[in-house]
């Protein structure tokens, strides 16, 4: 690891981990994570909270594993194979939290490691809270969803010449507003569903039309608007209600349906609809030691795609092409972090991204080389 004249790293860290009772708790005096050759060590300044931050440890409990995915902070250590980052760089990214194969890898901590290939430089003018509010976990997942599962044409530098209409179910969620923006940048026409109170939010991020997903006539209204030709749907929820709505909204010829949760088997009954499932950690290409259909073997091809997608994401950040979802700052402590996870679990959050700054949990950065 690189060293410098700025002092030495602390000998321990604090983190939010899963306890033996399968509840999140704060653990102090944990060892710093080992830094692999392609990784950077980050002093975490802010984290964002995602639904996966409770779903992962609920479904695949691993006592002692550090929770959390999204992070923003300052690089205080650099592995020998890392060329594009240096000490003191402001960065953001996403890791696989609650990871049974690498339980130390989550972001809900004051010091963490991140693979350099999946780490982004924060542009000047963006605070740590604003950067983490972009939701890199969601951006990574959407790269797989739009290109690998929906197989949409177009790219950042060469938008599609024949725009496709794409339904984003839950368009006012943080994943939804980012999906809408990415679809616009790729040259497509996003339409969305959400509750009426968030119609303006979805439109502000670029939705062409918005439909009330609580209305019994929602699917019929979408079919009428698309003239029964809709053939691309992104569904972050993938529960019984959303599956029913999305299937009814799909055009008569069928199409591609991308789920961000594991889908029920009955969705495969309509042969004209090609169903696919993606989840954030898949982008890293590592083996997923999970269960219930979420397990995956190592995937070098997906990793190669992910590396290229992150290069595009860096370009979008540098060019100021992405707007962050509205954020709600919860505080500056690990206690606030646990409360935020519980708020999401209780479904108390709508139209906002929960963010926690961690400045009160740590001293000023110390850089080592």
Swiss-Prot record:
It comes from Pyricularia grisea. InterPro entries: ADH-like_C, ADH-like_N, GroES-like_sf, NAD(P)-bd_dom_sf, PKS_ER, Trans-enoyl_RdTase-like. The gene is pyiC. Trans-enoyl reductase; part of the gene cluster that mediates the biosynthesis of the mycotoxin pyrichalasin H, a tyrosine-derived cytochalasan that inhibits the growth of rice seedlings, but also inhibits lymphocyte capping and actin polymerization and alters cell morphology. Pyrichalasin H is indicated as the responsible agent for the genus-specific pathogenicity of M.grisea toward crabgrass. The first step in the pathway is catalyzed by the O-methyltransferase pyiA which methylates free tyrosine to generate the precursor O-methyltyrosine. CDD domains: enoyl_reductase_like. Pfam families: ADH_N, ADH_zinc_N. Disruption phenotype: Results in the complete abolition of pyrichalasin H and deacetylated pyrichalasin H production. This is Trans-enoyl reductase pyiC. Pathway: Mycotoxin biosynthesis. Belongs to the zinc-containing alcohol dehydrogenase family.
């Amino acid at each position: 690891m690189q060293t410098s004249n700025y002092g030495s790293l602390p000998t321990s860290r604090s983190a939010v981990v899963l306890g033996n009772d399968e509840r999140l708790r704060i653990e102090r005096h944990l060892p710093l994570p080992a830094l692999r050759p392609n990784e950077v060590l980050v002093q975490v300044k802010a984290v964002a909270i995602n639904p996966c931050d409770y779903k992962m440890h609920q479904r695949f409990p691993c006592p002692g594993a550090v929770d959390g995915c999204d992070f923003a902070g300052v690089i205080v250590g650099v592995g020998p194979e890392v060329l594009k980052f240096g000490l003191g760089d402001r960065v953001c990214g996403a890791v696989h939290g609650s990871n049974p194969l690498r339980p130390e890898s989550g972001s809900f901590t004051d010091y963490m490691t991140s693979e350099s290939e999946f780490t982004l430089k924060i542009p000047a003018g963006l605070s740590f809270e604003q950067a983490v509010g972009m939701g890199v976990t969601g951006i990574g997942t959407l790269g797989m969803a739009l290109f690998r599962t929906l197989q949409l044409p177009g790219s950042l530098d060469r938008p599609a010449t024949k725009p496709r209409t794409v339904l984003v179910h839950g368009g006012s969620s943080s994943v939804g507003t980012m999906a809408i923006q990415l679809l616009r940048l790729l040259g497509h026409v996003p339409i969305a569903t959400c509750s009426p109170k968030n119609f303006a939010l979805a439109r502000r991020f670029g939705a062409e039309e918005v439909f009330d997903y609580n209305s019994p006539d929602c699917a019929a209204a979408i079919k009428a608007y698309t003239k029964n030709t809709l053939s691309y749907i992104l569904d972050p929820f993938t529960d019984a209600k959303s599956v029913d709505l999305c299937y009814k909204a799909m055009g008569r010829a069928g199409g591609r349906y991308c789920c961000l949760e594991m889908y029920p088997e009955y969705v495969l009954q309509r042969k004209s609809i090609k169903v696919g499932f993606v989840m954030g950690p898949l982008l890293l290409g590592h083996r997923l030691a999970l269960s219930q259909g979420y397990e995956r073997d190592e995937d070098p091809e997906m990793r190669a795609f992910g590396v290229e997608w992150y290069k595009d994401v860096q370009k979008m950040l540098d060019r100021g092409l992405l707007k962050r979802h509205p954020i709600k700052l919860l505080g500056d402590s690990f206690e606030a972090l646990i409360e935020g996870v519980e708020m999401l679990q209780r479904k108390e959050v709508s139209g906002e991204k929960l963010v926690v700054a961690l400045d009160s949990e740590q001293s000023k950065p110390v850089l080592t080389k």
